[in-house]
Amino acid sequence: GVKYIPISKESLPNHIKAARDSILNYIAETKKSSVVNGKMIFLQGSPKLLKKEGIHIGRLSGIVAHHTPYYLKRNQLPSFQTNCIEEWEKKIDAIVEETISEKMTLISGIPPWVKMYFEKIKKKTGKTIKDVFPDFELFIYGGVNYAPYKKGFEKLIGKRIAGIELYPASEGFIAYQDSQTEKGMLLCVNHGIFYEFVACDDFFNNNRKRISLADVKIGINYVIILNTNAGLWGYIIGDTIKFVSTNPYRIIVTGRVAHFTSAFGEHVIAEEIESSLNDAVKIIPTQINEIHVAPQVNPKK
């Protein structure tokens, strides 16, 4: 469903800053500045905004589209008109037509959206993405776990490609991948968010204890709680994370609070299921598009 989250004048620049820094970190680490010389696409929601009681309302990606830094905007695709198309299939078709002959170096979006875009290009040309966009260098993604999509993407692209994982949310930009060699994403600790955490094992207890960054430990699953300069206090976004480093603070997203099953006290979380699936496809090469997990408390057989 739709949720309305405040974005203040104080919080909006932090979304832009974190997204910008993710690209700048990549350039600083790899010394490959050519990634910003070609065309780049950000698959996002419509930038059309409604106005109610003097307040602009829209999708986060659409709002942010109005504030793209000028040095990125000059090479940004698609056009504003194409970006405003509401019907997703028509929008992707229009984006394909607009970008297929361009020198694309950077492509960004939620993996399912980008997958649809790549599939339409392959259907139209009969070629892999590396043959259509030989200068394509960097894939920026977020929103869902990329691991289940990785093999499918490598097949569509035709080669391995550098990637940057982002952890943006309407509530605040939480983390981004700052290294091609280190595991995890760098927690944004100077971006208008004060973080608190509750260990997942204690989350459903009445006496659950919140802790600050000073007390977190590596390897423990935490529910993340946000206090922001947009006006959110003690806000539970529903995600679970795990620290892989505390100097600097680096995290991985392990799932959702609601995505667990414990019919028999087993406390199975999304991270464990996805890890098992990844191990399985290494043994039996296959591609998994969708999964469903549920306990059979009273099976018929």
What is each of the regions a protein language model found here?
Residues 64-301:
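Active-site glycine/GP-rich loop and adjacent strand/helix microenvironment
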Residues 11-14, 33, 49-50, 120, ...:
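Residue-level detector of solvent-exposed, low-hydrophobicity positions
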Residues 1-17, 21, 29-31:
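Conserved AMP-binding A3 loop
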Residues 20-31, 93-102:
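Conserved ATP-dependent adenylate/AMP-binding module captured primarily in the ANL superfamily
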Residues 22-73, 83-86:
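Conserved AMP-binding loop of ANL adenylate-forming enzymes
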